Every structure is written in structure tokens, then in C-alpha cells.
Amino acid sequence: RLPQDYLATQFEGGTTGAIRKNLGVEHPAKPTGWYSYSFRFTLQASAEVALSTERLEQGGVAALSITGLTGEAAPAVETDLGSVQCVRLGSGWRAYIPAAYNASAGGHTANVTVNGETFARTLTILPKDFGTVEVEPEPASTEAANAEFRNNIWPLYEQPVREKLWVGAFLCPAENYMTLVDFGQVKVTGGQQGSRSNSTRLYTIPGEPCRAPAGGVVVFAGDLALTGSTVVIDHGCGVRSYLYSLQELSVTRGQTVERGQAVGVLGEELTMDFKLGSKSVNPWPLFQTSGGLFWQEKG
């Protein structure tokens, strides 16, 4: 309430009152009141987008770092190399780009859209000769077995990514093994070249444990007609390990596992397939902390 003979004045553009002294009043009381200021800021922050490498061999993985942006909206990444999703890592965002064994050699563009602004980065894929391997004819699979595999495994390729769960090198699931068919090799049967292998088949010692390659969450554990006893572990950031032809299973869907933990028992053979989304990548660099999965690992 104002003293008698005082006026309330509102200045143009303001939302609060101010006291104006009436000079006709002698010995006015000391004015008291409060002040309120409001400001509106527009902050324009430009993101920084960096690749772990500009040249990548077939079978490899490149990391994409996105920093210097505000807000919680995830950046969007588009590339013909595969489906790529971003996750929070440290103070920024991280995505991983696969170069499948059959990715076309040459330049590939990754378009990163952040807050309506698009950044283009070029990744050059280098060809790699994975060699050939003699194999026995594989028995034809039934349509029912193929459909069962598609219904249970293919949906995992496009699941939303979870936070990064691995730390350091991955572990080969079999401690003792001999490689029968390696990643990327052309399979030769009776002198005729066939398809390339997108997985690695190992000769293993029956009864030994099958180990989790890294920390993660089991997203599938069960028996399939096409691949036998199967375990799929989600390691975060779209990286998943697919372990086929186990003798026994010792984990269930939804279970959290640690690196080296037994997820089952090995039979005579183990097929392992490491994927980023739906694209298989070379497993051996993962066991040696080599490649984009280990670039600036803490963000």
C-alpha cells in the first residue's frame, strides 16, 4: 500500500510498479518496495562432431563423438553403412558405425542432425581380403527353422540401444579353441566358391564354459532349430554378441552378466557373431582393444 499522495507508475515494457515521488508533499516517508527483473536469453551452441578415424577396413568399427550441445534430445545419425543410434557418454553423445565385411569400398557419408543443424562426415571404407576356407556342404534348413530364427533374432537388430556396458577388451567366449571358419572368409565347397561368412566358427572342447565376452544383459536365451542353444547378450550402444550351438545354457533372458561369466557349456563347435545393429563386425579387434569401440572409452 502506498502512502497518501504517492503514485504508482508502470514504465513501458515493464510488468512491475515503481514509486514516483510527489514533489508537492513535504517530508515524505522513506519509500520502500521491491524490484523484479526478468531476462530472456537465446543460447546458440554449435555441436562438435568427430570421427575416431576417417579410413576404416571392412569388418571394422568407427566411433562418432558429438559434444558441445545443449538439451537432452539425442542426435540423429544417418548413413548407408547401417542403422546407427546415439547414447549418452560422458558430457556428450556417442555412436558407433559398422563397416560390414561386404560394405562397398570408397567414401560413405554420415549425416548427423543436432537441434535442426546437420553435419556431414565422410568415412572411407577400405577393402580387406579375408581369404577362403574349405567347408563341407551344409544341410538345407527348413522354412520353419528359418522363420523361427527370424521371429526370435531379427527383432533384436533394431532394439533401442542401452547405455554402454563394456569396459576394456572383449573376451573370446571359448578359452581353448581352433578356428574352423573365420569372419569374412569365402566358403568353398567342392571347388565352388560360395558366400562369405559373417560369423566365426570355432572348434571347442565339450564341457568347458562359454564365457560372456563383456558385461551386458541377456536379451535371448533359448533353443532354436537353426542355431541350437543360443545366447544373445546386449553390451550397450547397439553392440550385441550372438553365441550359437552351445551344449547347455546357464542364463535366462533379462539377466545381467559380467565379462567372463559362464553363460552356458560348450559343445564341439561354437559359432560367434558380433553385431552392431544388424551388421556383423570382425571379432578379433574386439579382443585386442583395437578399433572404434575403445576410442575415448570414457567419453
Please report, for each region that a protein language model flagged, where it lies by residue:
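Short strand-edge motifs at loop-to-beta-strand transitions and within beta-strands
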Residues: Y35-Y37, W93-I97, T200
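Short, well-structured beta-strand-loop connectors
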Residues: P209-V219, V251-L266
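Conserved, short, structured surface segments that act as functional micro-motifs
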Residues: V231-D234, Q255-G299
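Extracellular and organelle-lumenal recognition/adhesion modules and their flexible linkers in secreted
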Residues: R1-Y37
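Surface-exposed, glycine-biased beta-strand/turn segments
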Residues: T122-T227
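Cationic-aromatic interfacial patches
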Residues: L43-T122, P127
